[in-house]
């Protein structure tokens, strides 16, 4: 899908694949006051096994002093139940690993775009983000309508702080190739690019197209 000037990444994942197939369930469980995960660390009533409440700190800067924290297995399990999924306690370690790896790769791709502005802003930060699973981007709809690609299973908009300027990035998440034996996707394909909200972002997209 390298039809335009985007950073496209494919990440291999292992079973269970269904957990991420309907959009990231925890990405919408955000406290609007500080854009942090609501820390529901209590065991779910349907839970049959204990889950860790330990949270891993990401490499993604949130402020000058701290980085974003990923949800714990317990938080992720609770969020999935809230979204009407049927998670299994024994799958949470794999689900968390996929979730965290995907987000780290998204940030890595964002930094590739931001590298053009390193003289102005050597340390961009992720200010906030929003899940928009059913709000398909214009590019995703174009690829689906005219080239027959499947629609992404999830979309996030990330707002990056570039020395006080808010720059919006659109991230589309696609299912990767299908395993012939299981019939399920074994990878996640990530399409990261700045939204064309101003002339500067349009220029970046055009310049990257010709690189």
Curated annotation (Swiss-Prot):
GO terms for cellular component: mitochondrial inner membrane; mitochondrion. Residues 1-53 are annotated as: Disordered. GO terms for molecular function: holocytochrome-c synthase activity; metal ion binding. It is found in: Mitochondrion inner membrane. One of its GO terms (biological process) is cytochrome c-heme linkage. Belongs to the cytochrome c-type heme lyase family. Probable lyase that catalyzes the covalent linking of the heme group to the cytochrome C apoprotein to produce the mature functional cytochrome. This is Probable holocytochrome-c-type synthase. It comes from Dictyostelium discoideum.
């Amino acid at each position: 899908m390298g039809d335009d000037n985007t950073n496209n990444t494919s990440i291999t994942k292992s079973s269970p694949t269904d957990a991420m197939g309907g959009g990231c369930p925890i990405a919408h469980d955000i406290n609007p006051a500080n854009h942090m995960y609501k820390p529901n660390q209590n065991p779910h009533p349907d839970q049959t096994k204990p889950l860790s409440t330990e949270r891993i700190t990401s490499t993604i800067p949130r402020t000058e002093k701290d980085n974003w924290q990923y949800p714990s297995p317990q938080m992720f399990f609770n969020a999935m139940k809230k979204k009407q999924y049927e998670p299994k306690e024994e799958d949470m370690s794999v689900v968390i690993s996929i979730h965290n790896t995907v987000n780290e790769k998204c940030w890595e791709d964002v930094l590739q775009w931001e590298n053009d502005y390193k003289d102005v802003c050597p340390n961009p930060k992720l200010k906030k983000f929003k899940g928009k699973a059913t709000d398909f981007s214009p590019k995703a709809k174009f690829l689906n309508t005219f080239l027959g690609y499947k629609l992404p299973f999830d979309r996030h908009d990330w707002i990056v702080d570039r020395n006080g300027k808010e720059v919006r990035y659109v991230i589309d998440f696609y299912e990767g190739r299908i395993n012939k034996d299981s019939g399920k996707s074994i990878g996640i394909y990530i399409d990261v690019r700045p939204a064309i909200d101003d002339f500067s972002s349009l220029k970046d997209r055009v310049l990257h197209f010709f690189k």
